[in-house]
Swiss-Prot record:
A matching Pfam family: Conotoxin
Lineage, opening ranks: Eukaryota, Metazoa, Spiralia, Lophotrochozoa, Mollusca
Family: Belongs to the conotoxin O3 superfamily.
Keywords of this entry: Amidation, Cleavage on pair of basic residues, Disulfide bond, Knottin, Neurotoxin, Secreted, Signal, Toxin
Full protein name: Conotoxin VnMSGL-0121
GO molecular function: ion channel inhibitor activity; toxin activity
Record bears the keyword Glycosyltransferase: no
Tissues in which the protein is found: Expressed by the venom duct.
Disulfide-bond pairs as recorded: 52-65, 56-74, 64-78
Residues with Phenylalanine amide modification: 79
Secreted recorded as keyword: yes
Record localization: Secreted
Stored InterPro entries: Conotoxin
Organism: Conus ventricosus
Amino acid sequence: MSGLGIMVLTLLLLVSMATSHQDGGGKQATQRDAINVRRRRSITRRVVTEACEEYCEDRDKKTCCGLENGEPFCATLCFG
């Protein structure tokens, strides 16, 4: 094989490697965005009133997670 043929094959190999690397980064970014959206939704679902916040603060709990059966639900961490 001539030197020109080897150079062309090498160039094609490098181009294919570079494009596959870029595609992988795009997939990772999409997955990362999907995870961030899930986290944001779980945080914004809870409905908190000032009365609930004060109730939890008086009982040495950190966070009001919302109402459960009409009663304030307090916890250190809120899930969902």
